[in-house]
Amino acid sequence: MGHCKVTAVCDSLASVGAFATPAGSINTQGQAGGMLRRPPSATPPSTTVPENVLPELRALEKILEQGGANLQVRVVREVRVASGASFPIYSIGIGNPSPDIPAVGFFGGVHGLERIGAEVVIAYLQNIVMRLRWDTTLHQQLEHVRLVFMPIVNPGGMWAATRANPNGVDLMRNAPVEALDRVPFLMGGQRLSAGLPWYRGHFGEPMEVESQALCEVVRTELLPRPFSIALDCHSGFGV
């Protein structure tokens, strides 16, 4: 399928109120009596996430329940934080899973401080899930495209309200490659200290678990296809 058709499908998906639910109006109120139950297709994390510490995650899990069998939900990794809680990193697939079909990936929450990026992806996912109840045109469109969502790549950083992950690593600087040309001091990535912004992690160590999760989703869901595109949502210049 060519670029034009993919663009047309994406435009159509976004046309009927794609962002009709503002990020600030996501329903983050949990079910009465406790935390939201994870969908049957998702592997539950080993430790219950404390209530009211990560409303974006609770909002996401409520949407996953509403989506039911229309969604292919997977916990790619889990991230443990200082409190002992464990947060899941979710990957959600919607539409035709055939590797011959183009795909669009939506990613958010790479930097924990930049909550708006995650909320935008969650709001769009919520819009799609709500429309699946009545929009026959959307169902027809999803026969020709695969949508992949990873709304909260860095739940530990979001829980701690930090740009970096719980290990102090900036996931946008965490890669096993070295620039050939000069990069801006510190901002281009540094290995001096996790106490400074833009820390890349120790030289020679594996990528952080969040980076591994992101790469796995891209490698399995996007790269094998004849055409794919990814949208990574950030917000502001959180340090």
Where are these regions (language model features)?
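Active-site/substrate-binding loop(s) of hydrolase catalytic cores
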Residues: 116, 123, 127-239
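Short beta-strand-to-loop junctions in surface cap/lid or active-site-entrance loops
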Residues: 89-100
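Di-metal (Zn2+ and/or Mg2+/Mn2+) metal-binding site signature of metallo-dependent hydrolases
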Residues: 111-119
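Short, conserved beta-strand segments within well-ordered enzyme catalytic domains
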Residues: 90-92, 105, 148
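Short beta-strand element of the alpha/beta-hydrolase
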Residues: 102-108
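Short glycine- and acidic-rich boundary segments immediately preceding or forming the N-terminal edge
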Residues: 4-6, 10-20, 24-90
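Histidine-centered divalent metal-coordination motifs
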Residues: 109-111, 234
